[in-house]
Amino acid sequence: MKILAIRLKNLASLAGEQEIDFTREPLSSAGLFAITGPTGAGKSTVLDALCLALFGSTPRLESTSASSKVPDGRNELSSNDERNLLRRGCASGYAEVDFVGIDGHRYRARWETRRSRDKADGALQKSQQSLQDLETQQMLAANKKSEFREQLEQKLGLNFAQFTRAVLLAQSEFSAFLKASDNDRGALLEKLTDTGLYSQLSKAAYQRASQADEQRKQLEQRLEGSLPLAEQARAGLEAALESHAQARLQEQQALQRLEGQQQWFTEEQRLLQSCEHAQGQLAEARQAWDALATERETLQWLERLAPVRGLIERLKQLEQELRHSEQQQRQRTEQQAAGTERLQGLQARLQEARERQAQADNHLRQAQAPLREAFQLESEARRLERTLAERQELHRQSNQRHAQQSDAARQLDMEQQRHVAEQAQLQAALRDSQALAALGDAWVTHQGQLATFVQRRQRALESQAQLPELEKSLAHAGEPLERLQAQWTALHGSEPDDLAARLVELRRQTDSLERQQALHKEWQQVLDQRAGLARRLGELDQRMVEQEQALLDLKRQGSQCAEEVKAAEQALQVTRELLQRQRLARSASVEQLRAGLVDGEACPVCGSQEHPYHHSEQLLAALGEHDDQEQVRAEQSLERLRQTLVGLREGYSSQRERLNQSRQEQQELTGQLAALDRQLDQWTLPEELRLLQPSAQLEWLAQRLDDLAGQRQQCQRDFDRLIARQRQTQQLQQELRAAETILQQRQQALTEQRQRYEHLQQQVEEDSQQLRPLLSDEHWQRWQADPLRTFQALGESIEQRRQQQARLQQIEQRLQELKQRCDESSWQLKQSDEQRNEARQAEERAQAELAELNGRLGAHLGQHACAQDWQLSLEHAAQAAQSAVETLQAPLDSLREEQLRLAEALEHLQQQRQRQQDEFQRLQADWQAWRERQDNLDDSRLDALLGLSEEQATQWREQLQRLQEEITRQQTLEAERQAQLLQHRRQRPETDREALEDNLRQQRERLAASEQAYLETYSQLQADNQRREQSQALLAELERARAEFRRWGRLNELIGSSSGDKFRRIAQGYNLDLLVQHSNVQLRQLARRYRLQRGGSELGLLVVDTEMGDELRSVYSLSGGETFLISLALALGLASMASSKLRIESLFIDEGFGSLDPESLQLAMDALDNLQAQGRKVAVISHVQEMHERIPVQVRVQREGNGMSSLKVVG
């Protein structure tokens, strides 16, 4: 994996578009480069952009909390939202990275975000990520972030956590890792390798073992309180239950007999009320029939009027049709006269339009020859105008070329003069620095040697200056040790064994209080359950009373509904018989007799001279339909009553089932209450608790639990105080060991510093002997006074002389080019002047020709603007005349057709009116004849009968029919209920009503007592059954719990701990072995002198110094440079672990250089040189000036004011 380019826009302090291209010089050939800049300028933002483009997040954002918010306009963003990196006041931003994937292809990953409407004050939109294959230009992912993450990790070969460990090397974490304790080192290694799973497994094993142990103990306690009855006691309970069941059955049967006798009196009262109700309904029906006498007479007249009602309606319709046809005939006559007048006017206007059309056609034919000549003249004028425009353009271009060439000649002359002056200045400066000519020619060879000499002398001076500080530090190192020893003596004035014994005693007291709390809570739970059961039993008794009353109500309603069903069946039978008689009255033979009746003559059957049904076929049909509907209504009423009876029976069964369920629930609750009482009897409760009422018992237990909780808290506080003292002792021991270690380290550091100074001083003397032949006397004196500044001044002077030589060579070459270009410019200026004169003369000739042709064309066209306008005006006149003729011809033809249609319609209306008049006269004669036969029908009654609607008449007929049927039905019902009452009184019981009520009350009491005895015995048996089932189930469950506890206990012994450190130390030991192996591979390439190995403690580390006889050194004895070197090797080892088999060719180091002394810095630079020698591109982010001077290729982050920065690549 290799990074090729990083691009970004408007991220943090880096404003605008910025780019770092590792494929272009000087970065392409530089294995080591630095990202430099002042603090806060934006160096780390480059790494943020790298992570953003690849993963949409950064390590800095991942370490923040999502709960904290950052304001963004009217909204808020979480602190770990990657969009916080967008620069304030910018509408959009992006981060883009080109890289080489594990398959060798080049890819481009991009992250971008923008604000709504691309405005700086718009709301932030969701960020977007895309991945593109640069080899095939194919977009691999562009919309879904999950798809992008999957594709990127597949192509890159690393996820986010692996990338931050393998590519972004934060070696300062390993500096802390080296000198941490075992626990801290395990936690750091867990964080660095992302293997927190092992701590979680250790905690989970401990928790599961504790849970399994707790469950096992609870089951053992439950089993102790679930012992069943002996076999002899159980047999006695079963015999008692059978006896109570027989007694309860006998009492129930006796109660049913008494309830049957009570039901007779209830039924007698109901039948009396039913008879009175039927007599009242019959009287009301007869009154309603008498009140409708007027309606019955009106219906008889309607039957007599029915045969001529159609004749009357037809006469009225013919009167309206005659009036309407007369009005239509008059309108058609007027329309025909108006149409004739319009027809004559249109014919005159059409003749005039045809004459104007002939004149316009004649004018168009005469103008054809002049039009052709005018078109030819216009075509020639357009050609001359194009020629004139082309010559004007040529004239303008020649003027422009002449002006440009003149300006170019003047600029070349001025440039030539400037270069001649600069040439003279450079030649003078080179003569002044001629003394550096020889050293400058070999500067590349001697620069590294001079830099090494400067560094060694500087390190020697710094080493000499550090010696007094180290001596002083050694003198002060003993003071903390003496102070800590005095604290130890003061702290352990009492016996340590006494502290341990007190801790054990407090733990024992705490355990005892916890057991008492658990026991009291169990008592409280059982008493609370018992109070709840008693409350539920009271509510259940009340509900059972309500259910028994509801059962009696349903039984009474069912009996009443059954009687109504029986009455409805009898009424239906009576209705069917009446309807059968009415149908016989309308049978076929009766219809034949009725058809032979004659108005005014006697009926052969009854002798009446009035025959109301003779002409009332419609009335007979309506009566037949009404009979059918009446039978259907009676059947539907019977069906509804039957359904109601079924519903009442089902409700009775359901209510009885609910009562049985309540009785069963009562038995179960009674059994549970008895079981709780037995459980309380088995416990040894305090005497004062047993003497209290149930409600007071719960209050006593609550107070006792509060007291126990206070005692336990006091024990816990004492225990915590002793634990704190114990921890203080352990802390003091650690501080004593650390003070002793610091004293030893300072002694060793002073010895090593003295040896280092002597070695450096010897190297400085050797460097002086090699350097003297290279410098002149003046430079040698400066060198001895200030080597660093002299070296810098020499480098700047030699670099300046080299640049002056290169610039002088460029100027001489440029002067030759300028001389040649000046000669060419003079010749071109002369040529352009000649071309300009020729273009001006051609333009003047074209203007003269065009003016002469425009004069001829104007005389020919006259008042017309052009030939096209002249032709169009003639054609428009001809077309307008033709359109006028066509416009008049169409309405003339239409008007003629309309006149013909009006004549036909007028003739049809006259014929229709004659037919209507004939029919009206015939019907009028029939109506007069019918009126003469009706003696008692005057005009007022006739108008009233004709004004009566058919709906009203039908309503009266139906009302009369219903009243007649209701009278019949009520008569039948009253007779039936009298018969039912008589039959019921024949079955009167011997006991009177008052004595029967007393017998019922006494029987119910006996039944309740019998049921109570039965339920108590049944509850005892059920409780014993539950105990038997529970004991068997608990034994099986306890065995499973013990097996589960043994399994988790073994696992807890191996890896379990409450803090998770047990398995973490085991797992991180393996990780540490693997990390040491990978780090030693890196050390062999960076510095073969050192090698890491485990030792000193469980997770301890030692350094093997091969140049000191494989001496084992403590990590506390390493110098700053050695610590950096070991930390870098550990970071590279972790990167190798994270990347597995993937080769990482790009590394970024962001920490750890600011605290290094010059010698350590030199050692670090040597390690970095070895690192880049492995073929990797290494980027170092630091603001240390010494590193900037030693790394020539840099990416500089430059501040530009107003919080903005930019990137610049130098080298």
From Swiss-Prot:
Q: Does the keyword Nucleotide-binding apply?
A: yes
Q: Which residues bind ATP?
A: G37, P38, T39, G40, A41, G42, K43, S44
Q: Quick one: a GO biological-process term for this protein? A: double-strand break repair
Which family is it part of?
Answer: Belongs to the SMC family. SbcC subfamily.
Keyword Chloroplast among record annotations: no
Any coiled-coil regions, as ranges: 115-156, 197-407, 497-584, 628-1048
Q: Which GO terms describe its cellular component?
A: DNA repair complex
Which UniProt keywords are present, listed alphabetically? Answer: ATP-binding, Coiled coil, DNA recombination, DNA replication, Endonuclease, Exonuclease, Hydrolase, Nuclease, Nucleotide-binding
Output one GO MF annotation: ATP hydrolysis activity
Name of the protein in its database record? Nuclease SbcCD subunit C
Q: Basic and acidic residues bias: where?
A: 71-81, 410-419
This chain's function reads: SbcCD cleaves DNA hairpin structures. These structures can inhibit DNA replication and are intermediates in certain DNA recombination reactions. The complex acts as a 3'->5' double strand exonuclease that can open hairpins. It also has a 5' single-strand endonuclease activity.
Which organism was this protein described from? Pseudomonas aeruginosa (strain ATCC 15692 / DSM 22644 / CIP 104116 / JCM 14847 / LMG 12228 / 1C / PRS 101 / PAO1)
Question: Domain of life here?
Answer: Bacteria
Where are the stretches annotated Disordered? 62-81, 392-419
What the entry lists under Gene3D superfamilies is as follows:
P-loop containing nucleotide triphosphate hydrolases
- Subunit and interaction comment: Heterodimer of SbcC and SbcD.
Q: Which InterPro entries match?
A: P-loop_NTPase (IPR027417), Rad50/SbcC_AAA (IPR038729)
